[in-house]
Amino acid sequence: MTEAIIEKKNHKKSINDHDKDGPRPYVCPICQRGFHRLEHQTRHIRTHTGERPHACDFPGCSKRFSRSDELTRHRRIHDSDKPKGKRGRKKKSETIAREKELELQRQKQRNANDSAAVDSAGGTSANVIEPNHKLLKSTNSIKQDGSTFTEPLKSLRSKPMFDLGSDESDECGIYSVPPIRSQNNSGNIDLLLNAAKFESDKASSSFKFIDKLPLTSSSSSPSLSFTSHSINNSSSGLLLPRPASRAKLSALSSLQRMTPLSQNSESYNHSQQNLVHLHHPAPNRPLTEFVDNEYISNGLPRTRSWTNLSEQQSPSGFSSSALNSRFSSSNSLNQLIDQHSRNSSTVSISTLLKQETVISQDEDMSTEDAYGRPLKKSKAIMPIMRPSSTMPPSSGSATEGEFYDELHSRLRSMDQLPVRNSKDEKDYYFQSHFSSLLCTPTHSPPPEGLLPSLNQNKPVQLPSLRSLDLLPPK
């Protein structure tokens, strides 16, 4: 059916071609198509048979073509550097192979040129190698000699000559490095080595000295002591080490800086005395006593506040440390008892409170300093008396006998703490007639009448499970 349709179409074409172009004597025996020339007929017949007699003669190429014009077109790909594919599109496989071949050829030419250049320059290269070795040896020797110059410089750079500080440290920044005159290389090296050695010794000694300093040395004008030390050592002309760390400032030092210095001579004498304090510190000297004595010895005015209570010795024989500990929040009744036991005189707690009020009134009266300037009044902080559940509401002050009775009772209760039963514990917590006003618990227990009776808290005896008639569940 299909063959009949194809024959009809070819017959119509042959008739139309014959009518247009003239006769077509060469007719295809398979499809009955006519051609004007014989080569056209043979080329057409090869499409039916699949014969390809025209083969490519390029080495490595196995392509064959049915027409000769196709073979000539294919040969242009091998001959030209930039081959053109069919219909203007490049074939990737052919272009890649061609590029590889071109690169191999170029690389071979380069290798040949390099080998020729090496052969021509072989005689001159041997003459150049020997002076190069000599130059390398000379540079190595120079580097070894130069290392002796750089090592002391590195040691100097590693140690800082000065520290950055605030305005307080700027006042005492007299540390300076003298200029090194470059006369001879050997002289400069010796000077640098001596300076580095001196600096290391000074730095180690300063570290040891600062570690041994007590707290009082840090609170006593560090800037003046450092300036005096630098003035004494400035004539030596050597490198001076900076102290390892700045002296720490406390609350007393801020009050100390508020007082002006009278004269330059007094400041110099004050710095010399501070230097003596730094070199010979007192081991067991309290902070407040050191500062107060320092101001008293130098004649410097100072504001009157709670910090200088050590100047006013109490008539009862209490020291300044005992009074200061009275106002600190962390001290308890036990510390006051220890201080009381160390002194020979026995004073009750009410006398201490009276002395405190007298001191506060004296301080309120002094509103001017030695220079006639008004001072800020410090408010006297009175202790708050809290009612105790274990103390009867008595209007009079606690006597000495009641104080010691309460102390002994508390010590006995602490000794009997492990063997105390529930009844003793109840009696201990509800001692409402033998205690003082000072020892007040933070949370007072409720009165004895509000608690349930002991009969309600007794455990109820229940029968054992085995004695009960229990049946298993059904």
Curated annotation (Swiss-Prot):
Annotated localization: Nucleus
UniProt lineage: Eukaryota, Fungi, Dikarya, Ascomycota, Saccharomycotina
Keywords: Carbohydrate metabolism, DNA-binding, Metal-binding, Nucleus, Repeat, Repressor, Transcription, Transcription regulation, Zinc, Zinc-finger
GO terms under cellular component: cytoplasm; nucleus
Main location per the UniProt record: nucleus
Gene Ontology process terms (BP): carbon catabolite repression of transcription from RNA polymerase II promoter by glucose
Record-annotated membrane-spanning stretches: none
Basic and acidic residues composition bias: residue spans: 1-23, 45-55, 66-83, 93-106
Signal sequence extent: none
Species, as recorded: Kluyveromyces lactis (strain ATCC 8585 / CBS 2359 / DSM 70799 / NBRC 1267 / NRRL Y-1140 / WM37) (Yeast)
Regions of compositional bias (Low complexity) in chain numbering: 310-325, 462-474
Family note: Belongs to the creA/MIG C2H2-type zinc-finger protein family.
UniProt-recorded Gene Ontology molecular function terms: RNA polymerase II cis-regulatory region sequence-specific DNA binding; zinc ion binding
Protein name: Regulatory protein MIG1
